[in-house]
């Protein structure tokens, strides 16, 4: 008998690396998107923490009036923020090596641009990693599609809006009070409350919260009883068991009687598709609204739209909101310009008698 022995070629280091990166047996899946995601998110997180604690004041408006945002410069967790890159930089790419010194880079708000660009790249890679893992496990791609909603929203406020406005200084500050300041200024300049895409986003977020609470409470309440009436229903179950613990037919019947028959789902897949699609579509529309308002396609303007027979204005809520917008705009960047942009754009009255 003749035996043929073949030498098995040892796998190259690159081959072993590829297999490890794409293995679904790892405790945490890395994937090719993860190769880019890990360093970008680590960079963004590290710089954010350091800057939030110790970054010096930033000349956000480009008028030599620095604004303090870090903890060591007098802020607390609520008031602290990473101050956006200076208006003097505009939309220029501003890495450390473009500045004359690190002090200049910090003064002009370089950390903000570094954090935002690394963060956006990182979350986009996280979305790609979700798709990649789903693909390798033979799943459908809808997890990544759902995650695209917050990715689109973050991209809108951190990248698209600054591009439309012409400067990273108009981006959203990275902090609690900074976020609220961004929202107030956005309302003052773009009347976002009167934009239909924002209204769809509000319906998506609040509606999604309501539907999630309704679904969770229904599932928790419609248990398949495995015990007698003298025992707790909880005694009939163990954590992580394979058998179903609730009856969707019972939940459907309860909800149908609570509202009306066709207000409830009797199909689990249809129900969960609805729960995913409602907030995702709403947030997509909000991101689209921010992206259009970035280029000054603003919310509806119904100011002074109701007048009496004498031509006198009868104020509506639109006029009240407009008055509030002007007040907020007066307070915004109060040292950068003397008048709100809406007032400054009006032609001056003639002084010739």
Curated annotation (Swiss-Prot):
Residue sites binding chlorophyll a PD1 per the record: 198
Binding residues annotated for a quinone, in chain numbering: 215, 264-265
One Gene Ontology term of the molecular function aspect: oxygen evolving activity
Residue(s) at site: Tyrosine radical intermediate: 161
Domain of life: Eukaryota
Residues that hold chlorophyll a ChlzD1 according to the record: 118
HAMAP family (UniProt xref): PSII_PsbA_D1
Subunit structure: PSII is composed of 1 copy each of membrane proteins PsbA, PsbB, PsbC, PsbD, PsbE, PsbF, PsbH, PsbI, PsbJ, PsbK, PsbL, PsbM, PsbT, PsbX, PsbY, PsbZ, Psb30/Ycf12, at least 3 peripheral proteins of the oxygen-evolving complex and a large number of cofactors. It forms dimeric complexes.
Name of the protein: Photosystem II protein D1
């Amino acid at each position: 008998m003749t035996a043929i022995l073949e030498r098995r070629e040892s796998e190259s280091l690159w081959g072993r690396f590829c297999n490890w990166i794409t293995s679904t047996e790892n405790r945490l899946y890395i994937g090719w998107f993860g190769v880019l995601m890990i360093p970008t998110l680590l960079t963004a997180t590290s710089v954010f923490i350091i800057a939030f604690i110790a970054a010096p004041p930033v000349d956000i408006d480009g008028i030599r009036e620095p604004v303090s945002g870090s903890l060591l410069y007098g802020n607390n967790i609520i008031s602290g923020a990473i101050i956006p890159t200076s208006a003097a930089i505009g939309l220029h790419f501003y890495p450390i090596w473009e500045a004359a010194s690190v002090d200049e880079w910090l003064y002009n708000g370089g950390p903000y641009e570094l954090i935002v660009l690394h963060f956006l790249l990182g979350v986009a890679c996280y979305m790609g990693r979700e798709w990649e893992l789903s693909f390798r496990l033979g799943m459908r791609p809808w997890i990544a599609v759902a995650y695209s909603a917050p990715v689109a929203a973050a991209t809108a406020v951190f990248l698209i809006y600054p591009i439309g406005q012409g400067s990273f200084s108009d981006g959203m500050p990275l902090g609690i009070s900074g976020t609220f300041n961004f929202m107030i200024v956005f309302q003052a300049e773009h009347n976002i409350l009167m934009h239909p895409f924002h209204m769809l986003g509000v319906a998506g977020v609040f509606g999604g919260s309501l539907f999630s609470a309704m679904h969770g409470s229904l599932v928790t309440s419609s248990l398949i009883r495995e015990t007698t009436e003298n025992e707790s229903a909880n005694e009939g179950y163990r954590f992580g068991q394979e058998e179903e613990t609730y009856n969707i037919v019972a939940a459907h019947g309860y909800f149908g009687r609570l509202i009306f028959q066709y207000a409830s789902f009797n199909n689990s897949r249809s129900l969960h598709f609805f729960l995913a699609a409602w907030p995702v579509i709403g947030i997509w529309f909000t991101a689209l609204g921010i992206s259009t308002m970035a280029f000054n396609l603003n919310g509806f303007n119904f100011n002074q739209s109701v007048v009496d027979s004498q031509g006198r204005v009868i104020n509506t809520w639109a006029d009240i909101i407009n008055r509030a917008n002007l007040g907020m705009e007066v307070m915004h960047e109060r040292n950068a310009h003397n008048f709100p942009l809406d007032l400054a754009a009006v032609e001056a009255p003639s002084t010739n008698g």
